[in-house]
């Protein structure tokens, strides 16, 4: 009887230890940080990240500052590190402003990734990238060229800020493409809405009023593009080409009314999912060097590319770029197929 009891205790102890180990393993936590909360684009990315977390048994926390600031993001990063999160995935408002905090986090063993907007590559392991600057800059100009068929035209650029990494890289490439392929296009102004819906609308209306002969507004920003469309409707400017990047749910009414003929983006829900799957691969010590691939359920295979794809000169082991499989141009024929 005593021997039976000892065996039972041993079995229960082993079961308890196994359960505890499983609990510890399942308790991995990932923080997914946007530039700011309250914007549909970032919310959709967060939804994708949390869906992936549920599928993987990982606790994914979505949180960000109420305004797009380095200090707000640094505070969140530090908080998550102090709470012993295993990985942090951040859409950086600055290429270098977050670097000291991110490097400290990496020194403490936290896996650091970026999504949507990158830091300097030495400040993270992988960037989950919607497209190279050349791809997205070209996409912007091509969408505008579909509507502006004049040799000489006036174009305005309008997006979030002069310091944000991703949009400035795209705009730099777009301006270079205009210079090479549309030398008659004059870029009359470049202005910013600073991720604020009210300010973005005011700025867009100001651009349209200041340039009554404007032919196109290129707005590669989730707040700026709908603001430009709303401004055109408010001021009854029906002959203005408005293109850029935003989510289909936000832009649907403008497309249905014909104010916006086409605009672009990528599947940001997929971007959130891919980010968490890559972070999970790092936490599981799976090989993730340049050339290595990862199969993601419902999405397919993604491959690690060198940082040079983004125009960087920094390469290191365990460091690189994971490109989304595709980008999308939305118009009245396909917009109702998407819900994000």
Swiss-Prot record:
Cleaved signal peptide residues: 1-26
InterPro entries reported in the protein's UniProt record: Bact_Solute-Bind_Prot2, LsrB, Peripla_BP_I, SBP_2_dom
Record has Transport as a keyword: no
Subcellular location: Periplasm
Keywords, comma-separated and alphabetical: Periplasm, Signal
One MF annotation (Gene Ontology) recorded for this entry: carbohydrate binding
Main localisation: periplasm
Record flagged with keyword Signal: yes
One Gene Ontology CC term in the entry: ATP-binding cassette (ABC) transporter complex
Subunit composition and interactions: The complex is composed of two ATP-binding proteins (LsrA), two transmembrane proteins (LsrC and LsrD) and a solute-binding protein (LsrB).
Role noted for this protein: Part of the ABC transporter complex LsrABCD involved in autoinducer 2 (AI-2) import. Binds AI-2 and delivers it to the LsrC and LsrD permeases.
PANTHER family xref list: ABC TRANSPORTER PERIPLASMIC-BINDING PROTEIN YPHF, D-XYLOSE-BINDING PERIPLASMIC PROTEIN
Sequence similarity: Belongs to the bacterial solute-binding protein 2 family.
Protein name as catalogued: Autoinducer 2-binding protein LsrB
UniProt gene name: lsrB
């Amino acid at each position: 009887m005593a021997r039976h009891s000892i065996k039972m205790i041993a079995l229960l102890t082993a079961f308890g230890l196994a359960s505890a180990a499983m609990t510890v393993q399942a308790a991995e936590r990932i923080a997914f940080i946007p530039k700011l909360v309250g914007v549909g684009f970032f919310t959709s990315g967060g939804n994708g990240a949390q869906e992936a977390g549920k599928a993987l048994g990982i606790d994914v926390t979505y949180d960000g500052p109420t305004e797009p600031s380095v200090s707000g993001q640094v505070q969140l990063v530090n908080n998550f590190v102090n709470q012993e999160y295993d990985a942090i995935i951040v859409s950086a408002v600055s290429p270098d402003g977050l670097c000291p905090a991110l490097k400290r986090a990496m020194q403490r063993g936290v896996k650091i990734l970026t999504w949507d907007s990158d830091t300097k590559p030495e400040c993270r392991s992988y960037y989950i990238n919607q497209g190279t600057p050349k791809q997205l800059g070209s996409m912007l100009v091509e969408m505008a060229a579909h509507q502006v068929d004049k040799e000489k035209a006036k174009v305005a650029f309008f997006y979030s800020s002069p310091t944000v990494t991703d949009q400035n890289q795209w705009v730099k490439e777009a301006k270079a493409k205009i210079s090479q392929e549309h030398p008659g296009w004059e870029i009359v102004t470049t202005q910013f809405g600073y991720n604020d819906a009210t300010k973005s609308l005011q700025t867009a209306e100001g651009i349209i009023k200041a340039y009554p002969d404007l032919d196109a507004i290129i707005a590669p920003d989730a707040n700026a593009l709908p603001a430009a469309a709303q401004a055109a409707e408010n001021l009854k400017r029906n002959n203005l080409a408005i293109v850029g990047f935003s989510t289909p749910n936000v832009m649907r009414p403008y497309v249905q009314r014909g104010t916006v003929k086409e605009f672009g983006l990528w599947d940001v829900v997929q971007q959130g999912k891919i980010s968490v799957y890559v972070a999970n691969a790092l936490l599981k010590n799976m090989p993730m060097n340049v050339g290595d691939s990862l199969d993601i359920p419902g999405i397919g295979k993604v491959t690690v590319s060198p940082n040079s794809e983004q125009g960087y000169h920094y390469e290191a082991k365990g460091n690189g770029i994971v490109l989304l499989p595709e980008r999308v141009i939305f118009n009245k024929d396909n917009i109702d197929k998407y819900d994000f």
